[in-house]
A protein has these predicted regions:
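Short hydrophobic targeting helices and cationic amphipathic motifs
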Residues: 6, 16, 30, 35, ...
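Class II aminoacyl-tRNA synthetase-like tRNA-binding/catalytic domains
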Residues: 96-336
Length: 537
């Protein structure tokens, strides 16, 4: 056994390159047939100039030449290079590597709409959405991730036989692109063949290929994995994706850092009885009502943080606006001058997101018949003033001075739409009695807090405000509430060691989506709702 430096050639992405390897050579001193493995070596490639390690390769050399330059006849023996990078030596593949590059074989609707493929043969993947058999010709509509595509099947020309195709079969169609104004996308594919990738074993229990499914919400939810294949149903969740995308993009642009807080804890951030309790390795635990404590902790780390994640509320409500699990869009920001900074940040998010939906989700909005709300300016009104306005305008008595009843929220939304043509309104300075212990009281009137709700067409979609950042003030507030600090030691720790003035909010994603789309039930805009009666699917 001896150490030997040897010059070698390697082929990477089809380019012949000269490299150097070194390693221990196990040499055979006796004749070995060409078909046998003559040499086994463990080598590593290095950059000749910097000696930087570039790869570690286990080589199995075939044949009887083990040193020196490769013979010319060997250099020509390399196998064809596929889309994967391969190492060759002596004309043989040693191993291949993933490079992150994919070879595009099929096209998308957006590719065809660019005009590049008109009159050309293409491959396109999709599920058979609907088949309209017209005799010698059939229209096979495919459902793709970008929408519906009409393909033309010609008897005697297209393969396989039409009877082999069925709705919901996954296929790859091969055909020529032709302009057709009457087709869903303004073009059609004149099919040469359909490759059937898979076929269903049972017919659909629900007519998902109709523009509007004529069925109840409960049936749609029972069959949710299938009902979501309806193009209008899935369009709702494309819009919802746009909302979350807007939330992330806008806050990133404002210097926020995304965090991921735990959803199992020892206690709830909001207190109260609306907690889901569970056993956690012989300990008591709860599902997170909110990421509130963790958001505040992370303000001391990053100044500005946000999270889009599920929260859990064990509230026994059975209404069109309540869920027991929903997605909360939360942010918390430090070094604020006023709780109005938080409202301004939310206004900026809404403006950015509506523009994003208008430009990049126009197809879905048109399909759903949505007109986006106005967010140029959002009015704000004090809690007590809002109650007075509604009572006076709509001849309604104030029954609960400490909170807004659902009917009052609706009337506040109606009032500002009628008087100011406003779709949103901030209601500020909620009573301290109805806000959590960490809410900062208004120094001018401690019966009220520096907090707010955002109403959208009369429905609360956001709760937020400024938090207490002074340790002693927080201790006093906890004592005034008759609470104990037990179980909150880590939370209180951040205030002992200094926190900046800060505040934040939480937005209910499903509620916001519901109001944007004009739905009247939050379950319509929840992928798989969890409520009093539903744990499946």
């Amino acid at each position: 056994m001896r150490c030997r430096y040897q010059q070698n050639e390697r082929k990477y992405d089809g380019v012949l390159q000269r490299g150097w390897y070194r390693g221990f050579i196990f040499n055979a001193d006796f004749p070995v047939p060409d078909s046998a493995i003559a040499v086994l070596g463990l080598f590593y490639f290095t950059d000749k100039e910097s000696s930087r390690l570039t790869s570690l390769v286990l080589f199995f050399f075939m044949g009887d030449t083990v040193s020196g330059d490769l013979p010319p006849e060997r250099r020509q023996g390399a196998a064809p290079v596929s889309k994967r990078a391969k190492y060759y030596t002596r004309g043989r593949i040693i191993m291949d590597f993933m490079t992150g590059k994919t070879e595009k074989k099929t096209v998308l609707i957006s590719d065809i709409l660019s005009g590049e493929y008109e009159g050309k043969e293409v491959l396109l993947n999709g599920a058979v959405h609907k088949i309209r058999d017209m005799g010698e010709v059939a229209f096979v509509v495919l459902r793709t991730r970008e929408g519906l595509v009409q393909t033309v099947y010609e008897e005697g020309t297209t393969t396989p036989e039409l009877k082999e195709l069925c709705e919901e079969a996954a296929v790859t169609v091969k055909g020529t692109v032709a302009l057709e104004e009457r087709a869903p996308q303004g073009f059609e594919i004149r099919a040469v063949s359909f490759e059937i990738l898979s076929k269903p074993v049972e017919p659909m229990p629900i007519a998902i290929n109709k523009w509007k499914m004529n069925t109840s919400l409960e049936t749609k939810l029972d069959l949710r994995p299938l009902s979501l294949r309806n193009v209008k149903e899935r369009a709702k969740f494309r819009v919802q994706e746009g909302i979350v995308r807007g939330f992330r993009d806008y806050l990133h642009s404002q210097g926020f850092t995304e965090i991921h807080s735990p959803k199992i804890g020892a206690r709830g951030a909001e207190g109260g009885a609306n907690l889901f309790r569970l056993e956690y390795f012989h300990k008591h635990a709860v599902l997170a009502q909110s990421p509130q404590f963790y958001k505040q902790m992370m303000v001391g780390v990053f100044d500005r943080v946000f999270e889009a994640a599920p929260v859990f509320r064990a509230e026994k409500h059975n209404t069109k606006r309540h869920l027991n699990e929903y997605t909360s869009l939360d942010f918390e920001m430090g070094y604020i001058d006023s709780f109005e900074d938080i409202m301004e940040m939310e206004t900026g998010f809404l403006q950015y997101t509506m523009k994003l939906l208008e430009t990049e989700y126009a197809k879905e909005l048109k399909m759903l018949g949505v007109t986006l709300p106005k967010v140029d300016e959002i009015p704000q009104v004090r809690f007590d003033k809002a109650k007075e306005l509604v009572a006076e305008k709509y001849n309604r008595k104030i029954r609960n001075p400490f909170d807004l009843e659902p009917e009052e929220e609706s009337l506040i939304g109606q009032y500002f739409k009628e008087e100011m043509d406003a779709d949103f309104v901030f209601v500020t300075h909620y009573p301290s009695k109805k806000r959590p212990f960490y809410a900062m009281d208004d120094p001018e009137d401690t019966n009220y807090t520096l907090s707010f709700d955002l109403l959208f067409h009369g429905l609360e979609i956001t709760t937020g405000g400024q938090r207490i950042h002074d340790y002693l003030a927080l201790v006093d507030k906890i004592a005034d509430r008759g609470m104990t600090q037990e179980g909150m030691e880590q939370y209180m720790m951040i205030f002992k060691h200094g926190m900046p003035p800060h505040g934040g909010l939480g937005i209910g994603l499903e509620r916001l989506t519901m109001k944007i789309l004009g739905e009247d039930n939050v379950r319509e805009t929840t992928l798989f709702p969890r409520d009093l009666s539903r744990l499946e699917p």
